[in-house]
């Protein structure tokens, strides 16, 4: 679907001793079934933009639409439910629960939505097997490699069949070959007609996206790849 996610005149400022405007009148439309890379130096607004799209934070000014429906940032509970069902989030530091196994980390994300433990366990096990972790189901995060941990994080992000996947430096701490595998797992999500947006400093992976978006001076400059 074209223009599934629409950002219009988005600005975001943070109040410090001096007001800092990170995003400046940013507008862009994203389509499903595509993967977009965000590039830019540290402080260019990549993570801030992902936080706005994920509804973790709100813009100072501007409008965000999903499927032509505007987000009301005063409806926190409704937005939390929308995010849990429709947006999968992956971080460089994968934020896995340290006292839970790989299987538990994934199935708990679905249990909060489905309220069906057996169904959640089955979905989680199937996803982990698909990403090559059938022999790591009962391993804790401390027992997993960086690449294995990110595979768990990706499985957790997609278990609720989200329409959008957001990834903030998902390959940043991985060696090149492992990072390639993780990128391919993300790229394959296009086949499920999902919208994938990932922030990266790595030009190689940025160029593999359908669209490369440079974050410059708080706005987006599209670059065709």
What are these regions (language model features)?
Residues 140-150:
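Conserved ABC ATPase signature
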Residues 62-73:
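Conserved ABC transporter NBD signature motif
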Residues 165-168:
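Catalytic Walker B motif of ABC-type/P-loop ATPase nucleotide-binding domains
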Residues 159-163:
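A short, proline-enriched helix->beta-strand linker immediately N-terminal to the Walker B motif
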Residues 39-41:
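The feature captures the beta-strand-to-loop junction immediately N-terminal to the Walker
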Residues 54:
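Helix-to-loop junction immediately C-terminal to a conserved catalytic motif
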Residues 100-109:
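Short coil-to-helix segment of the ABC ATPase nucleotide-binding domain corresponding to the Q-loop/switch region
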């Amino acid at each position: 679907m074209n223009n599934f996610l629409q950002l219009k005149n988005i600005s975001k400022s943070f109040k410090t001793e001096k007001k800092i405007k990170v995003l400046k009148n940013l507008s862009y439309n994203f389509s499903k079934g595509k993967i977009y890379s965000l590039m830019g130096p540290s402080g260019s607004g990549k993570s801030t933009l992902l936080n706005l799209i994920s509804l973790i934070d709100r813009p100072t000014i501007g409008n965000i639409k999903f499927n032509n429906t505007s987000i009301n940032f005063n409806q926190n509970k409704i937005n939390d439910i929308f995010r849990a069902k429709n947006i999968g989030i992956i971080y460089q530091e994968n934020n896995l629960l340290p006292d839970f196994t790989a299987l538990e980390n994934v199935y708990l994300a679905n249990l909060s939505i489905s309220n069906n433990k057996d169904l959640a366990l089955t979905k989680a096990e199937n996803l982990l097997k698909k990403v090559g972790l059938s022999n790591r189901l009962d391993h804790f995060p401390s027992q997993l490699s960086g690449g294995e941990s990110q595979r768990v994080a990706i499985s957790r992000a997609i278990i609720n069949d989200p329409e959008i996947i957001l990834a903030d430096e998902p390959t940043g701490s991985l060696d090149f070959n492992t990072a390639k595998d993780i990128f391919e797992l993300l790229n394959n999500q296009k086949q499920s007609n999902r919208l994938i947006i990932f922030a990266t400093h790595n030009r190689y992976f940025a160029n593999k996206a359908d669209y490369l978006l440079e974050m410059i001076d708080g706005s987006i400059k599209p670059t065709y790849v």
